Amino acid sequence: MIRRYNADDEIQNARRNHTVMNTLWAPWRSEYITRPKDVSCVFCTAPQGEDPLILKKTKSCFAIMNRFPYTTGHCLVAPNRHVGDIAEVSQKEFSEIISLVKEIVSAVRKAMNPDGFNVGCNIGAVAGAGIADHFHVHIVPRWSGDTNFMPVISDSHIISEHILVTRDKIAEQLSGAQ
């Protein structure tokens, strides 16, 4: 007989034994690791289709949930045009990007009630950009006592909610703001 994984059993065992859970569940990581490598730019293709993680599209830019988030609610805002450096972004595009960043921060704040945010850009691979060829802004909600130290000590991220559930919460706040 095959026993199915039951998170409730593990939680009860951890409480009973005064131990911590030993499983970090991130099923989307294996999807990323095992999928065929795509040579196209994800930030160029995502807004052209019906990507379910897209939160909002504007004339010059779009907001999308990060497929590999640092924390629950980690969003990205990128220009529609393929540019690798902030210096290549026009003033008009930059204004629209910042306006959308503000809108996403507000929606995430209402949907998730974080204690703060990290908002920023990693320009170039040496600066930590996972997708260095297309400029984008990270919006990372933070909570007091969150586990954001995990990437530093074990290259792990703890995400407590399915990404599409989080996306729906944020999208609901965006549609309510209009």
Name what the model sees in each region.
Residues 1-178:
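HIT superfamily nucleotide-processing domains
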